[in-house]
């Protein structure tokens, strides 16, 4: 029994059961509709699209006036476009939020790097002052040993000029150097953490912007460009050969490519058709009497 001999009621029942069991989606119905005019007419039935509308958009309420004026397939398409626009808008908002987060992490990194540079300069200045004071103290100790009278007079003059003694300044500079080192350690730790979060946000943004079809097309375009250069090089190398045999080879290759393109053109519909016809015998044996099947 061929597919053309099956009555419309049975085809309609097959499509209805497929939609109810979630075996057929709106994509499958669209692929089935382009296989023949008969299936196009059956797949546009309002009862099938009513089931899909309830299943895919359970929160959508269809008014009686709109359902009577326009077919259910048009209502489903309108609702699908609205849902698609809503998802695209939500995706754009998520991208903007992620980009704002990345810019905030970048600003935080620049701020920490500036503070780290200031602390490093402060530490260097304190260490230079500390080393100068150490040299002064060592020189004063040596002079006190070899020329005590001169040192006493010089120290008396320095004490009168400076209110803070050398030992106190050394301790203050030492504490300031320790504080600078602690600040640098904390800033380095915070900078590593912020950079780690910045890298994570960059990867998340790349994954959010990833589009398989667009990226695949860009890759294929690059491959085609390189393949074109390779083909040109091979053609220039083999041009000195027999031109007649090359023409025959090109014709044979063109015919093979055309056959391959015709086969690949129907490969997308063949999977849906195979699923459709593999699903239909179960319904046929269930709803058609055995005597008709024998015929």
UniProtKB/Swiss-Prot annotation:
Instruction: Give the domain of life.
Output: Eukaryota
The segment annotated Disordered runs over: 217-245
User: Which keywords does the record carry?
Assistant: Coiled coil, Ubl conjugation pathway
- Supply the InterPro entries for this chain: F-box-like_dom_sf (IPR036047)
Instruction: Specify residue ranges for compositional bias: Polar residues.
Output: 235-245
Q: Which residues form a coiled coil?
A: 82-129, 167-209
**Could you name the Gene Ontology cellular component terms for this entry?**
nucleus; plasma membrane
Which pathway does the UniProt entry assign to this protein?
A: Protein modification; protein ubiquitination
According to the UniProt entry, the note on domains is:
The F-box is necessary for the interaction with ASK proteins.
Q: What does this protein do?
A: Component of SCF(ASK-cullin-F-box) E3 ubiquitin ligase complexes, which may mediate the ubiquitination and subsequent proteasomal degradation of target proteins.
Kindly provide the name given to this protein in its UniProt entry: F-box protein SKIP24
Organism this protein belongs to: Arabidopsis thaliana (Mouse-ear cress)
């Amino acid at each position: 029994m061929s597919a053309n001999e099956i009555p419309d009621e049975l085809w309609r029942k097959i499509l209805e059961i497929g939609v109810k069991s979630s075996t057929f989606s709106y994509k499958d119905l669209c692929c089935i509709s382009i296989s023949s005019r008969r299936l196009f007419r059956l797949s546009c039935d309002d009862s099938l699209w009513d089931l899909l509308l309830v299943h895919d958009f359970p929160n959508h309420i269809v008014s009686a006036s709109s359902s009577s004026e326009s077919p259910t397939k048009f209502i489903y398409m309108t609702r699908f476009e609205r849902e698609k626009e809503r998802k695209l808008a939500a995706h754009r908002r998520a991208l903007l939020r992620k980009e704002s987060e990345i810019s905030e992490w970048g600003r935080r990194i620049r701020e920490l790097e500036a503070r780290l540079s200031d602390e490093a300069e402060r530490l260097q200045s304190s260490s230079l002052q500390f080393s100068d004071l150490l040299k002064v103290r060592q020189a004063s100790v040596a002079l006190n040993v070899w020329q005590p009278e001169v040192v006493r007079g010089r120290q008396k003059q320095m004490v009168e000029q400076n209110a803070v003694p050398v030992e106190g300044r050394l301790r203050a500079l030492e504490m300031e150097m320790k504080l600078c080192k602690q600040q640098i350690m904390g800033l380095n730790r915070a900078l590593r953490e912020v950079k780690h979060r910045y890298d994570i946000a960059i990867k998340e943004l790349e994954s959010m912007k990833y589009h398989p079809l667009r990226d695949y097309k860009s890759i294929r375009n690059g491959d085609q460009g390189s393949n074109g250069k390779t083909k040109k090089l091979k053609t220039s190398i083999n041009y000195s050969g027999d031109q007649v045999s090359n023409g025959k080879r090109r014709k044979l290759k063109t015919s093979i490519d055309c056959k391959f393109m015709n086969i690949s053109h129907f490969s997308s519909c063949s999977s849906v058709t195979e699923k459709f016809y593999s699903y239909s015998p179960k319904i046929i044996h269930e709803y058609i009497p055995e005597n008709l099947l024998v015929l």
